């Protein structure tokens, strides 16, 4: 038996296939693909910050003007970006994502499912730097050339791959007024990024034409070549378990456990961390003593406690040193320039998982034939071993560490009314949130 779905649009494609091989075994796959040509848009931030008293354009010289002296060192006339830098970027992005799975039901109450997912993207960008002249009444000749007065081109190619595999064993059973679902699993996640960029400016008297067909670094002066690159890999491995139980459909309980390992801390000995959660709910409106309340359709009381982890930092290898180009020096006879390197940040061999402990209690209710919905929650969250970067001071490089603890607590209340008048439906809602933050250490 096959179940299929396919769609195509301008620059994208979607396809899904499911096959029932036997009565208790099925396989399938899903695929998404897209080709995107991002528009060469310009930021509006400069326009918002520009002093409104400045003249935009000088009619006599036929040039856009610079901003007043107190601003021109920080930014350009926004019309320079809109008009003179328009259509100077060509980008082409591709993305393909999908998954394949197999699902096997056995021994009446068991199911084993394997899912393999992948997401791949490739982004290419070419940029052109034109020669831009502006009117500036404060300079000799009243005409100023922005930048170094040379045309230039740059290219950048970035690829990113994300791969995830999930292996899940589920037990599900209902007996009498009891219902139980238990899940055990093992998951892996891998993320890799590679970026390579290069740039050149024109040779003496050889202006690079403003033609996208020419925007390749090979057209520039080799003596002005610069380049940059980035590459990193990250991975996590997780073992997990979860239990969902309810009695009579009104007494609810859940509990979970997971053990996560992160490559971010693989050189510190702290890569593994355990996390837990428990929760309970009482569907109070299903009790006999609540049946006669006609204006109340549903009332549930709930509470939960749990821990979560965070491994995310801007630095892919925070426990290892990273060198970057710094100043150069001249040595030897004949003289030669030797590049210098410095630490990009101070590595920390003692880094560990950031851990968040949170609990909340609350209630949900529906009134007046489910037209009015209410939800209220009081929560408290404490973050320990906070992962953060310490800025460098007086020329020193930044550092990374588990720098403290923060407490957040507050109340969240939401009301929503949904109804229909004739053929017209409407929805009115509102919410109230309070939050109090406190630095504990």
Language-model features: where?
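Single conserved hydrophobic/aromatic residue that forms the stacking wall/gate
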Residues: 1-14
């Amino acid at each position: 038996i096959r179940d299929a779905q396919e769609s195509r649009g301008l620059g994208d494609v979607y396809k899904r296939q499911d096959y029932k091989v036997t009565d208790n075994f099925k396989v399938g796959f899903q695929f998404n693909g897209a080709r995107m040509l991002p528009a060469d848009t310009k930021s509006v931030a400069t326009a918002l910050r520009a002093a409104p008293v400045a003249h935009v354009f000088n009619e006599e010289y036929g040039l856009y003007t610079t901003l007043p002296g107190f601003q021109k060192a920080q930014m350009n006339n926004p019309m320079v970006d809109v008009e003179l830098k328009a259509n100077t970027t060509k980008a082409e992005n591709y993305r393909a994502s999908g998954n394949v799975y197999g699902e096997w039901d056995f021994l009446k109450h068991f199911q084993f499912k394997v899912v393999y997912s992948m997401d791949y993207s490739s982004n290419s960008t070419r940029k052109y730097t034109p020669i831009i002249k502006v009117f500036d009444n404060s300079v000799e000749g009243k005409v100023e050339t922005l930048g170094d007065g040379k045309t230039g081109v740059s290219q950048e190619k970035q690829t990113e791959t994300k791969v995830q595999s999930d292996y899940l064993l589920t037990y599900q059973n209902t007996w009498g007024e009891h219902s139980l679902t238990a899940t055990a699993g093992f998951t892996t996640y891998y993320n890799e990024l590679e970026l390579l960029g290069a740039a050149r400016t024109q040779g003496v008297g050889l202006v690079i034409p403003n033609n996208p067909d020419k925007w390749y670094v090979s057209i520039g002066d080799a003596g002005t070549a610069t380049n940059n690159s980035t590459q990193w890999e990250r991975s996590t491995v997780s073992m997990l378990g979860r239990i969902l139980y309810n009695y009579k459909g009104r007494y609810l309980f859940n509990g979970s456990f997971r053990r996560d390992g992160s490559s971010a801390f693989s050189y510190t000995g702290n890569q593994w961390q355990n996390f837990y959660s428990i929760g309970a709910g009482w569907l109070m409106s299903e009790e006999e003593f609540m049946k006669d309340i006609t204006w109340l359709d549903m009332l549930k009381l709930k509470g939960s406690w749990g821990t979560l982890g965070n491994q995310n930092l801007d630095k892919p290898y925070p426990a290892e040193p990273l060198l970057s180009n710094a100043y150069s020096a001249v040595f030897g006879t004949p003289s030669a320039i030797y590049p210098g390197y410095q630490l990009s940040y101070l590595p920390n061999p003692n880094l560990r998982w950031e851990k968040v402990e949170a609990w909340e209690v609350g209630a949900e209710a529906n009134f007046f034939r489910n037209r009015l919905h209410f939800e209220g929650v009081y929560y408290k969250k404490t973050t320990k071993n906070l992962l953060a970067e310490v800025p460098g001071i007086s020329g020193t490089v930044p550092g990374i560490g588990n720098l403290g603890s923060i407490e957040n607590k507050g109340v969240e209340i939401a009301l929503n009314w949904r109804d229909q008048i004739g053929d017209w439906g409407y929805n009115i809602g509102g919410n109230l949130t309070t939050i109090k933050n406190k630095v504990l250490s």
